């Protein structure tokens, strides 16, 4: 597969049409999907802008524009006018940006901790008189009402200052007529705080201690504290998503040994040019893409192809950056340098897949565009209506008209507080992902959990996913009267120091059976062939057909061996000086749980595909054994990426399961990328979900957990809307028309609190998921 020229750039080149320029921006200030929608909508309506995609997971914008109609600077000014801060990607220094992001994350965590601690203290103080909780006498409300109110005011203001960004962003977006979740938080907490200020005034002005029950400083503080914690967790998950690309780049060697004027000179990788001759020692990482001009070796391309068995490389064969030279010195002529190598193109595909993947639209953000202005309008309208009715004596009230109208206004805003709406999705996701972690399923984001619920197609990589990923001895076939244990003893003795996966598998098999090995003399390792050695004065050869043919052993029992190869097995031949005496077959063993997983997926009408860089014969054998619906063998990383994209274009919701670097573009492109925890770090970083153990049957558990969580979210949203929408007419004075009593803001706050309690309690039911 790797011998064919892999043109990963093709997919990227096709995206550049006409004379369009591409602008990549990092946009600060994005807090939710409403922000994303606003930026995309504004840019898409701008003349000259052909495409505008904003990714909420990394706050990056991918913009294509016609330079004849609009300049990049003009696009950035449009974004600035919307209230955001765009920066060109090329202007960002990776190290400085990483340090800045890390510092910001630590700061957010510290602020969240302080806000939560202060809010809990405030809640304790505010509830002390209701439950008889002990407090210092200096703030005991009966004797020191001023101190009691003042301490609550001070703590609430402190928490609100800590969370000032919610007010800055929320009110700005509200005044620009495009409210987001920050707007909901700002309006709700401000309403509670303003009403508390009014009640504080009334307590002191009227010397009415009983009004202390109507203070809601703790509500404002607690909402801010919990939302800050949620934002921190969201930022944390966003940071992990971008680590995959950095690790892909880091797989490349930092130095290269160049032959110049007959001498070997070590230089930085960015100084290597096309046409240079690179010298690569055994065990070294290959620094560039190129062609072997001298030497032969076996190359471990597992980080590129995902296949565990090293590939034999001879003169004129191609080698790739990031792979490892196992056992022979090589001279390679460079044909692709840093930024142009296969591994660099894989990194680019991962990045592009992350950019073009549409983030799931969050219902709460969509609703907020209508919900917040509607609630504010209703509150103002209801207050004005009652003022009009009172002024013109249509109705009479038994209290000050201003206080009556203000109570109506504040009660509506408090009962319609977005706390429950804001908690509906993240609380269920938090519990769901926590439960997943308990079950060995690392779910990196709520978005992945939501998308997994929609999956109807799963694409599996073979090696290390459906199979163990390492070869194991399957059969030992003796062609003489030598028994199997003796054959294994001889072969393992020859491979005692082998680093080759096949040789190591033979040695491990003997070790597992506690077989004592022979001493081998006159040992010789021949690259691409096998090994030769003497045991008790008798010469043995262990390796492939080429080794035996080179030593004039002609009868290789090819028909018999071919039967095993048809079963997808690899053979090692053992011969003495005269003839072939035995052969050992090895194969990448299918995981025990793979068959059960495929059966369960079929029952749920989920279609399965297997993609692998392995040969067609081996792939078909494994696919038939497992009952996989379709299989595509000998595929490159680009082929896997394209197959996932092709399935998506057919309208399928695709999950990709893999464990190697070659899987990372497909993992990123898929609706949900799932990595085996024992796989490479890159696959794990590129994936949305990581199976911490080797039991891939947890894939089905993850699907069930996703379905349970989405169902829970829908229930939460129902209760959130139920409490809010049913409470608004009551808060608006409906109760007064029938009973002569207004809904006290304290009751409105209780209703708001109950809606939050119901949402959280419902989400906690996910803890019982099995």
Residue ranges and their predicted role:
Residues 47-65, 69, 73, 215-217, ...:
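Conserved cytosolic catalytic loops of P-type ATPases
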Residues 11-12, 18, 22-24, 96, ...:
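Juxtamembrane coupling segments of multi-pass membrane pumps/enzymes
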Residues 97-118, 169-192, 347-381, 455, ...:
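Soluble-to-membrane junctions at the N-terminal ends of transmembrane alpha-helices
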Residues 1-147, 263-264, 344, 348-356, ...:
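Flexible metal-binding regulatory segments at protein termini and peripheral loops
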Residues 478-604, 616, 628-644:
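P-type ATPase nucleotide-binding
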Residues 14, 107-255, 366:
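Transmembrane helix-loop-helix hairpins at the membrane interface
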Residues 131-146, 175, 194, 435, ...:
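Membrane-embedded alpha-helical bundles of multi-pass transporters
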Residues 20, 37, 58, 537, ...:
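Conserved ATP-binding TGD loop and adjacent catalytic N/P-domain core of P-type ATPases
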């Amino acid at each position: 597969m790797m011998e064919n020229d892999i043109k990963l750039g093709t997919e990227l080149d096709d995206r550049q049409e006409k004379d369009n320029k591409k602008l990549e921006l990092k946009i600060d200030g994005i807090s939710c999907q409403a922000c994303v929608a606003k930026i995309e909508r504004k840019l898409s309506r701008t003349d000259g802008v052909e495409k505008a995609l904003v990714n909420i997971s990394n706050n990056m914008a991918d913009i294509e524009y016609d330079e004849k109609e609009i300049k990049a600077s003009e696009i950035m000014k449009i974004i600035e006018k919307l209230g955001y801060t765009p920066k060109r990607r090329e202007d960002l220094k990776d190290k400085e940006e990483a340090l800045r992001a890390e510092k910001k994350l630590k700061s957010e965590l510290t602020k969240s901790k302080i806000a939560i601690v202060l809010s809990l203290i405030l809640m304790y103080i505010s509830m002390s008189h209701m439950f008889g909780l002990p407090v210092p006498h200096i703030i005991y409300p009966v004797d020191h009402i001023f101190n009691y109110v003042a301490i609550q005011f001070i703590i609430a203001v402190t928490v609100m200052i800590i969370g000032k960004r919610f007010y800055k962003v929320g009110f700005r977006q509200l005044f620009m007529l495009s409210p987001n979740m920050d707007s909901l938080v700002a309006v709700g907490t401000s309403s509670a705080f303003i009403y508390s200020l009014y009640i504080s005034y009334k307590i002191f002005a009227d010397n009415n201690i009983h009004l202390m029950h109507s203070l809601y400083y703790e509500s404002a503080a607690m909402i801010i504290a919990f939302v800050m914690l949620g934002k921190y967790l969201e930022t944390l998950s966003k940071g992990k998503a971008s680590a995959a690309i950095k690790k892909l780049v880091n797989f490349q060697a930092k130095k290269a040994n160049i032959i110049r004027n007959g001498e070997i000179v070590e230089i930085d990788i960015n100084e290597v040019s096309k046409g240079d001759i690179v010298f690569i020692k055994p065990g070294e990482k290959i620094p560039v893409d190129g062609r072997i001009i001298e030497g032969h070796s076996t190359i471990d391309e597992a980080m590129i192809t995902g296949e565990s068995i090293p590939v034999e490389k001879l003169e004129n064969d191609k080698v790739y950056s990031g792979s490892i030279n196992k056992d022979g010195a090589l001279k390679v002529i460079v044909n692709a340098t840093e930024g142009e190598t296969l591994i660099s193109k894989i990194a680019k595909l991962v990045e592009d897949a992350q950019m073009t993947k549409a983030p799931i639209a969050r219902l709460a953000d969509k609703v907020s565009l209508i919900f917040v202005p509607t609630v504010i309008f209703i509150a103002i309208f209801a207050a004005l209506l009652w003022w009009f009715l009172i002024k013109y004596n249509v109705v009479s009230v038994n209290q000050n008209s201003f206080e009556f109208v203000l109570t109506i206004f504040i009660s509506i805003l408090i009962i319609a507080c977005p706390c429950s709406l804001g908690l509906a999705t993240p609380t269920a996701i938090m519990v769901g992902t926590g439960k997943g972690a308990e079950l060995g399923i690392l779910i990196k984001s709520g978005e992945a959990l939501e998308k997994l619920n929609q999956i109807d197609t799963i694409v599996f990589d073979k090696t290390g996913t459906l199979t163990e990923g390492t070869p194991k001895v399957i059969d030992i076939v003796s062609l003489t009267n030598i028994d199997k244990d003796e054959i294994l003893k001889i072969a393992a003795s020859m491979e005692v120091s082998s680093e080759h996966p096949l040789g190591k598998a033979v040695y491990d098999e003997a070790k597992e059976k506690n077989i004592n090995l022979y001493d081998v003399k006159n040992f010789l390792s021949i690259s691409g062939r096998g090994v030769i050695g003497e045991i008790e004065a008798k010469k043995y050869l262990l390796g492939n057909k080429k080794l035996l043919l080179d030593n004039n052993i002609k009868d290789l029992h090819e028909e018999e061996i071919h039967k095993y190869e048809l079963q997808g097995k690899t053979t090692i031949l053992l011969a003495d000086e005269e003839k072939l005496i035995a052969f050992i077959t090895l194969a990448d063993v299918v995981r025990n749980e793979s068959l059960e997983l495929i059966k369960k997926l079929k029952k749920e009408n989920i279609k399965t595909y297997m993609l692998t860089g392995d040969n067609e014969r081996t792939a078909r054998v494994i696919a038939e054994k497992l009952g996989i619906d379709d299989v595509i063998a000998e595929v490159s990383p680009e082929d896997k990426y394209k197959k996932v994209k092709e399935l998506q274009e057919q309208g399928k919701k695709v999950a990709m399961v893999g464990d190697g670097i070659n899987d990372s573009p497909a993992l990123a492109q898929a609706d949900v990328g799932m990595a085996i925890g024992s796989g490479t770090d890159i696959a794990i970083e590129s994936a949305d979900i990581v199976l911490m153990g080797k039991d891939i049957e947890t894939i089905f558990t993850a699907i069930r957990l996703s379905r349970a969580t989405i169902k829970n979210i829908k229930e939460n949203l129902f209760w959130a809307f139920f409490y809010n929408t049913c409470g608004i007419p009551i808060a608006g004075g409906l109760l007064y028309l029938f009973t002569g009593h207004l809904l006290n803001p304290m009751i409105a706050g209780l209703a708001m609190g109950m809606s939050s309690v119901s949402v959280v309690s419902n989400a906690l039911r996910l803890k019982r998921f099995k």
